[in-house]
């Protein structure tokens, strides 16, 4: 509204205004005449200006992130006519910071230079600090200026479209839009495309009087031609075709980029003069903006953060009276800027910090470490890079300065440390937080909640450093600190990046590091980059990759502590000083570790031998094993946990799980071995670590150095490779794998040290050299060697996994036994191949044949295993775990010996039939006791053949052993040809041949073939007999009874929870009928319904959440136990409100990782739960199953409490359509609106063409995150609500879209304009929002007496199908 039109309005009636203001229904939003009306405000107070007759309204800008800036320049004038229902507002041109962070005072100069060059095509422009602050507004609030440009172009398009026949109007944008008329070309797509390009020019035009770079141009203009930006802002709001024409000329000049800004401004001045000639000029409205804002600020108690030019003691009348007399009524409120104090530092601070951390006897390792600490703490060098060998103590280089900074009382320093992996994050949190010298917290806390004022050091990973949220918070640091703490004394300290070589060497992660270039490095006092493997070339490339200048070209010695000459350019443009301690000391790193390169047949087998030997020598020691793949990590952990306690980690685990496992291994002294991929080798510090074993055939030199570097105080490092399989394959973009040969020489080459190949001192801790090793390490090597010799003498070879293990996949070996309806992993629990060896599983194809009779001089040992030498063979079942088959009775020189489970040197045998654990197979005689069988018919002369169980003539001997243990049968003497000799009791003279399991033509006896159960194998799973059983190190057979318990448990669960149909669900288990299940069915409930950590453990069987060897899933299982468990959890949710369900989740915490145990717990209350559901949901089943109609007239409370209950069906529909029409026009976010009636804008939601774009729009504005934080949605998984828009509610969606078609058809048949009803995603957003709107739900359940509470979203959505009879008996949807 123009000021000249004020005469149309009468003087406002104060009482009338107050009444209208209190009645919010009468408040109608009216856009201002400027383009800045989008600032969300609310009326806080008002007063009447008796002199001007205006009512002054103080408004609060609700969308501002900075509450102290919320009251600046936002006092608006309101004039109300006697019969006028709109309040006409004039909103000041304060930018809306709702869409972006608060402007920073430290913008990266590179961005500003790029912007200026793009606009003006010049490279040399001088800026002052005020220019930086002004230009930073554009980058931090670019979305605002984009929207401003869009609105300007849309306004032009609307006006021009209204006059399509006006040729002058259609030609206004001819040059601007590729020579095409505006009506055809300036559509939505082109508006947005050109709007983005126009935004920076628009910004400069609006702020031209605030930039010193254009002061020369302004000074060159005559006084009457100076640019009036206030006039220009109003000129940029065309309302008539003639104004569009002038505005298009400005756009044309700016978009063509042919003229400098001066020429563009001259065009704007020319347009303004033409505009004034047309009589469209208007004086600026003078208000009490500054004075009233100052009064409001005083009332809030914020005057200490502002200073004003007038006294704060004047009352409201003085303020109003002084307005006319004051010529400086437009005075702005400026912020008080206080210079941050800086407490002096001294070298003694570092010494005191060391004594706090390590005690009074603290001393530096060497002079280099001392000088580096002083360089970091005292010097003005803005950026420092340090390369020191692993184990040198790089952490203390920044740890001690951080403790010294924390001791400063006048200034609070907040620093940040970033590491490459989550595993290292957990270790750093433990190390840096010890002794209580620093308050340490995860950087995620800072990103989500901001600075808490207590934490000294935030620790995060590289992904956090690259995140947009982190860079935005750093950019807004000054404003955040002043607003939060009302002081300038909270200061950004150090930015520390550990193992920064990964920026260059981690090729596969470089795309994740792109966001680091947006970080404002200049905001930090100092940047520190540390690594043990970053030579100058790697370090320089890594720093440039994150947007820094790189290393200083001149190499700096550590003794050169020169102060920087010019720091005005900022940290990001200043070269980084490199301190290379490895070159300074000229010592090859890792000489204190004994490095051994071995080629072996089986890497896991050799590694197991080494680990068992180490723990026998040093029972309290720890070890790290580095595998090449995640599958191999899980396989090793599964195989070795029976020998010692194991922790395994790889990249597929979640961040929280990695942190938890790392902390457990570091702090728990009973944990012995950490198995993982290379992520466990960087930076982690573990006490009692004595051995590192590497099984990766493709390690590069950096990975090798980092792995060996974990051995801080010496130890053993083994590089195990398989024979004839070493392949030095170079992975694309990465360093090549290490080569065969001297490891020390390759380390020297990597660090650029002098080669000593062929000279004295070439081998340092490698190739058998022990001269540089500590006494403890040498003693450990000698003890390991002695133990190896002792084991070789005793023939105590450990049979572990075959070499084919390296190529096997864990999903093929372990996980295929785990049933899961999600993963279709069929559970196989059957017997071994039909014809196997007695119990030994010798290496044959489909059937196992025992070894032929070995002829010795005086004695013969019957053997079943093949793989024998020329003289001896191992006995029947050598070193089995759970099953043993006794050998047949061998008659040699008048004495018969039966060998069973012989693990000795030559011919030691035990009693004939030893009945071992649950699955031992009896042998020779069936007519003896359960454990011993003798030789039959031994009383002969010299050549008697004693046959056992003879049921044939002289040519055939039948089976000796009967069926044992229901699974194993041994056939000792099967039918042969014409001259079969009983192989059990063979009679020889001096040299006897006892044949047990041989299959020949003339003189053969059948092998003792057994049908071995799955228990015969070491893991309880018979998989083609590829695994040899593993013998315990103490010569005792590893007797495993767990597999029988698993089998028994599996059978019990199968009987208790039978599910042979894919449609099986927990409601059927509870006993509900099929028609009841149809409506109570828990659709939309999946694993995401469960809160985080409940039934969601990784690395276990997905069907039962147990370790793979303890899996209780069974073959043919259609529905997994985990699915039944989360459905059972949903049933419990049906019966509990939010508070009760939260308590229930705490009560079942012991079952969060055990869905099978939870099902057992749930089944105990089976009958009680069934009765509760029948009682609580009787009304729901009556409505949904029997389709009973709800009549609003039956609700007494509804008729009395709500006008809607008295409306007709037509009125209800019109009200419904009107609400949706308003939401569509205002582009309001639907879910947020129906959640708490908050009218937030989300244009993308209404423009989305598919569900994916729709969900992305909601996620972008943070709807799902707010929903979880504000409502009971936080009791479900983070993806639960989002997935409601994708794969769930298909049936309801089909019905809804069908009803839309029917509605459109009916409207067209009646000849009326169809009412626009919402599409499915908007409709579902409404249902979800109302479900979590607790206030609405309570009110609805109170007014509509026929319904009660429902606590599951599927049931609430299903109620949308119910129809309600309105007051006029018209059916409307519920």
Swiss-Prot record:
Position of sequence motif DEAH box: 498-501
Biased composition (Basic and acidic residues): 1012-1035
Gene Ontology MF annotations: ATP binding; ATP hydrolysis activity; helicase activity; nucleic acid binding
Pfam families: DEAD, Helicase_C, Sir1
Nucleotide-binding keyword on record: yes
Residues annotated as domain Helicase C-terminal: 609-758
InterPro entries in UniProt: DEAD/DEAH_box_helicase_dom, Helicase_ATP-bd, Helicase_C-like, P-loop_NTPase, Sir1_ORC-binding, Y'_ATP-dependent_helicase
GO biological process terms held by the UniProt record: telomere maintenance via recombination
Keywords associated with the record: ATP-binding, Helicase, Hydrolase, Isomerase, Nucleotide-binding
SMART domains: DEXDc, HELICc
Induction statement: Induced in absence of telomerase TLC1.
All residue ranges annotated as the Helicase ATP-binding domain in the record: 375-552
Ranges of Low complexity composition bias in the record: 832-1011
GO CC annotation, single: cytoplasm
Binding positions (ATP): 388-395
Entry EC number(s): 5.6.2.-
Residue numbers spanned by region Disordered: 321-345, 832-1035
Function statement: Catalyzes DNA unwinding and is involved in telomerase-independent telomere maintenance.
Protein name stated in the entry: Y' element ATP-dependent helicase YLL067C
Lineage: Eukaryota, Fungi, Dikarya, Ascomycota, Saccharomycotina
């Amino acid at each position: 509204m123009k000021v000249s039109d004020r005469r149309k309005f009468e003087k406002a009636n104060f009482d009338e205004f107050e009444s209208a203001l209190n009645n919010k229904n009468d408040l109608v939003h009216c856009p201002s005449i400027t383009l800045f009306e989008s600032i969300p405000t609310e009326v806080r107070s008002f007063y009447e200006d008796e002199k001007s007759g205006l009512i002054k309204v103080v408004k609060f800008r609700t969308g501002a992130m900075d509450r102290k800036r919320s009251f600046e320049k936002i006092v608006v004038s309101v004039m109300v006519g006697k019969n006028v229902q709109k309040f006409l507002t004039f909103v000041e041109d304060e930018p809306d910071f709702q869409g972006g962070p608060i402007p920073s005072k430290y913008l990266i100069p590179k961005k500003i230079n790029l912007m200026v060059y793009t606009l003006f095509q010049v490279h040399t422009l001088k800026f002052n600090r005020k220019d930086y602050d002004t230009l930073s507004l554009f980058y931090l609030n670019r979305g605002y200026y984009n929207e401003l440009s869009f609105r300007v172009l849309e306004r032009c398009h609307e006006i021009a479209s209204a006059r399509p026949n006006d040729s002058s109007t259609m030609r206004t944008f001819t040059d601007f839009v590729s020579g095409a008329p505006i009506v055809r070309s300036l559509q939505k797509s082109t508006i947005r495309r050109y709007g983005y390009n126009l935004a920076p020019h628009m910004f400069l035009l609006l702020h031209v009087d605030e930039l010193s770079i254009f002061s020369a141009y302004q000074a060159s203009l005559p006084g009457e031609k100076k640019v009036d930006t206030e006039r220009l802002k109003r000129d940029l709001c065309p309302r008539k075709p003639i104004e569009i024409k002038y505005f298009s000329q400005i756009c044309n000049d700016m978009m063509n980029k042919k003229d400098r800004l001066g020429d563009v401004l001259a065009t704007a001045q020319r347009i303004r003069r033409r505009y004034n000639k047309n009589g469209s000029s208007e004086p600026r409205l003078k208000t009490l903006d500054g004075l009233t804002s100052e009064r409001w600020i005083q009332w809030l108690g914020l005057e200490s953060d502002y200073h004003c030019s007038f006294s704060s003691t004047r009352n409201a009348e003085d303020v109003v009276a002084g307005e006319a007399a004051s010529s400086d009524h437009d005075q702005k409120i400026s912020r008080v800027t206080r210079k941050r104090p800086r407490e002096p530092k001294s070298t003694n601070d570092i010494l005191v910090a060391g004594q706090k951390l390590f005690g009074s006897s603290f001393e530096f390792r060497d002079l280099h470490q001392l000088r580096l600490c002083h360089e970091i703490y005292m010097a003005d060098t803005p950026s420092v890079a340090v390369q020191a060998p692993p184990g040198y103590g790089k952490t203390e280089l920044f740890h001690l300065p951080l403790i010294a900074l924390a001791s400063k009382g006048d200034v609070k320093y907040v620093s940040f440390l970033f590491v490459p992996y989550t595993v290292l994050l957990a270790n750093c949190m433990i190390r840096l937080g010890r002794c209580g010298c620093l308050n340490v917290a995860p950087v995620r806390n800072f990103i989500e909640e901001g600075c808490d004022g207590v934490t000294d050091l935030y620790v995060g990973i590289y992904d956090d450093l690259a995140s947009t949220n982190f860079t935005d918070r750093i950019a807004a640091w000054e404003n955040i600190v002043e607003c939060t703490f009302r002081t300038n004394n909270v200061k950004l300290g150090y930015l520390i990046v550990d193992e920064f070589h990964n920026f260059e060497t981690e090729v596969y992660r470089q795309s994740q590091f792109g966001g680091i270039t947006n970080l404002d490095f200049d905001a930090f006092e100092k940047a520190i980059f540390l690594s043990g493997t970053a030579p100058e070339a790697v370090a320089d490339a890594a720093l440039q990759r994150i947007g820094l200048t790189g290393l200083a070209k001149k190499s700096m010695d550590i003794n050169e502590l020169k102060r920087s000459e010019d720091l005005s350019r900022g940290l990001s443009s200043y070269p980084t000083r490199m301190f290379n301690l490895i070159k300074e000391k000229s010592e090859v790193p890792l000489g204190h570790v004994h490095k051994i390169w071995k080629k072996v047949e089986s890497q896991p087998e050799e590694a197991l031998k080494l680990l068992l030997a180490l723990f026998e020598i040093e029972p309290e020691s720890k070890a790290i094993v580095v595998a090449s793949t995640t599958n191999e990590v899980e396989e090793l952990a599964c195989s070795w946990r029976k020998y010692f306690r194991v922790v395994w980690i790889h990249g597929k685990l979640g961040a929280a799980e990695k942190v938890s496992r790392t902390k457990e291994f570091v702090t728990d002294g009973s944990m012995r071995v950490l198995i993982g991929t290379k992520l466990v080798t960087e930076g982690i510090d573990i006490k009692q670590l004595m051995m590192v074993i590497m099984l990766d055939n493709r390690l590069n030199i950096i990975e090798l150095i980092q792995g060996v570097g974990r051995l801080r105080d010496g130890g053993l490092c083994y590089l195990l490779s398989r024979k004839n399989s070493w392949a030095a394959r170079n992975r694309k973009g990465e360093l090549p794998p290490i080569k065969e040969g001297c490891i020390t020489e390759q380390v020297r080459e990597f660090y650029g040290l002098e080669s000593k190949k062929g000279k004295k001192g070439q081998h340092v801790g490698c190739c058998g050299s022990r001269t540089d090793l500590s006494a403890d390490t040498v003693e450990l090597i000698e003890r390991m060697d002695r133990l190896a010799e002792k084991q070789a003498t005793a023939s105590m070879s450990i049979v572990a996994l075959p070499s084919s293990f390296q190529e096997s996949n864990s999903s093929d070996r372990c996980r295929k036994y785990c049933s899961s309806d999600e993963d279709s992993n069929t559970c196989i629990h059957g017997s071994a191949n039909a014809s196997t060896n007695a119990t030994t599983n010798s290496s044959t194809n489909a059937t196992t044949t025992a070894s032929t009779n070995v002829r010795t001089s005086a004695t013969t040992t019957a053997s079943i295993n093949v793989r024998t030498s020329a003289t001896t063979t191992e006995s029947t079942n050598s070193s089995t775990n759970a099953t043993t088959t006794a050998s047949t009775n061998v008659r040699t020189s008048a004495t018969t010996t039966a060998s069973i489970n012989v693990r000795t040197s030559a011919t030691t045998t035990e009693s004939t039939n030893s009945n071992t654990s649950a699955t031992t197979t009896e042998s020779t005689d069936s007519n003896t006791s359960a454990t011993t069988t003798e030789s039959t018919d031994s009383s002969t002369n010299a050549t008697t053949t004693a046959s056992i169980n003879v049921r044939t003539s002289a040519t055939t001997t039948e089976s000796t052993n009967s069926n044992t243990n229901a699974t194993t049968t041994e056939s000792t003497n099967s039918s042969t040809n014409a001259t079969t000799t009983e192989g059990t009791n063979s009679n020889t003279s001096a040299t006897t041949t006892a044949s047990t399991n041989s299959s020949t033509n003339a003189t053969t006896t059948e092998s003792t073939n057994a049908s071995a159960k799955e228990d015969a194998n070491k893991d309880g799973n018979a998989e083609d007999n590829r695994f040899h059983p593993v013998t315990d190190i103490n010569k005792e057979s590893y007797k495993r009874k767990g597999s029988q318990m698993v089998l028994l448990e599996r059978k019990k669960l199968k009987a208790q929870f039978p599910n042979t149909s894919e449609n099986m669900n927990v409601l059927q288990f509870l006993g509900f009928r099929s028609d009841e299940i149809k409506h109570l069915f828990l659709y939309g409930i999946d694993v995401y319904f469960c809160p985080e950590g409940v039934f969601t453990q990784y690395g276990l069987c997905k069907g039962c959440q147990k370790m793979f060897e303890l899996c209780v899933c069974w073959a043919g299982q259609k529905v997994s136990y985990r699915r039944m468990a989360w459905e059972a959890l949903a049933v419990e949710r049906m019966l509990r409100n939010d508070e009760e369900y939260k308590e229930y989740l705490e009560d079942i915490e012991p079952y969060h990782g055990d869905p099978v145990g939870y099902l057992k717990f749930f089944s105990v209350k089976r009958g009680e739960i069934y009765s509760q559901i029948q009682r609580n949901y009787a009304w729901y089943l009556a409505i949904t199953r029997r389709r009973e109609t709800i009549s609003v007239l039956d609700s007494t409370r509804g008729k009395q409490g709500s006008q809607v209950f008295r409306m007709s069906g037509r009125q209800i529909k019109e009200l419904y359509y009107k609400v949706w029409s308003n939401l569509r026009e205002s582009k309001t976010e639907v879910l947020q609106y129906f959640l708490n009636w908050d009218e937030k804008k989300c244009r993308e939601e209404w423009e989305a063409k598919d569900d994916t774009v729709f969900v992305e729009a909601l996620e972008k504005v943070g709807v799902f995150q707010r929903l979880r934080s504000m409502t009971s949605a936080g009791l479900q998984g983070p993806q639960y609500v989002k997935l409601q828009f994708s794969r769930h509610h298909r049936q309801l969606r089909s019905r809804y879209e069908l009803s839309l078609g029917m509605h459109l058809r009916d409207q067209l048949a009646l000849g009326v304009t169809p009412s626009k009803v919402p599409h499915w995603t908007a409709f579902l957003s409404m249902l979800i929002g109302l479900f979590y709107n607790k206030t609405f739900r309570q009110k609805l359940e109170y007014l509509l007496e026929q319904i009660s509470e429902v606590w599951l979203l599927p049931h609430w959505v299903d109620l949308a199908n119910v129809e309600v009879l309105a007051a006029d008996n018209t059916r409307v949807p519920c």
